[in-house]
C-alpha cells in the first residue's frame, strides 16, 4: 500500500507529463494529449497470501499486471531458480482465472518452467514474460527455451528483452546493443516478431550498460533498424506490448 501511495504521489506531482492508466482507452487518451502512461504493476504475488479478495483489492487500486513469483515460493507457485519442476499451486490456478476475468496481465518471468507451462495450459488470455531473453543464446535459468517462446506466441503473448548482461551473454557484465539485437532477432525467427517487446529491468540489474537508462533507447532502436524493417521495429518498441495490454485489460 505504501508503494502504491508513492506511485500516486509521483503521478500527482508530474500530472502534466504522465498519468496512470487502467484501461487501453486511457493509453489512447494520453497519446492524444502527448503524455506518457504509467501502469501500476506488482512483481511477486506474495501479498495475495492465498486470498482472492486481495487480488480484487489490487485491481481496484489500479494494478494491471502481476509477476506471479519472484525468487521465492509464494501462494501462487515457485521460482525457476530453486524449483523449476514445480507448477502453479491450486490457488495459483484459481488466481489466474480471476486475473483473466478482471483484466490483470499474468507475468511468467521468474516463474518455474512447470509454472510457465501451466500458464500456457490454463490462461484464457495472453500472458507475458516481462523481462526474459532467449535460452538458446544464453543458457541461464531465467531465459526461455525455443519451445517456450513458440508457446508464448501461440497464446498471443510477448517476452520483454531483459537488459541484464548475464542473461544475454554468459560470463559478462557489460550489456551491448548488439547482444540485445541478437536476442530480438532469434526470438523473432523462432516465434515471430510479434512476440518481441522491451523489458529492460533498469532498476533490477547490476550490469554496466552501453546506454544507462531509457534516454539511451534510441541507440537500441538504431541497432534494431539494422536487422528489422521499420514496421517490425515499431512492433518491438511498442506495438506488441500495446496489443497485449489491449487484449488483456480492455
Predicted regions and their residues:
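Flexible, glycine- and charge-enriched loops at secondary-structure boundaries
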Residues: 85, 89, 173, 177, ...
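Mid-to-C-terminal alpha-helical segments outside catalytic/metal-binding sites
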Residues: 212-250
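Extended, charged catalytic domains and RNA/DNA-binding interfaces, predominantly
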Residues: 1-162, 166-169, 181, 185-188, ...
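Short acidic/histidine-rich active-site segments
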Residues: 163, 191-212
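Conserved residues at the C-terminal ends of beta-strands
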Residues: 69, 199, 239
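Short, solvent-exposed loop/turn segments at secondary-structure boundaries
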Residues: 139-141, 171-174, 208-212
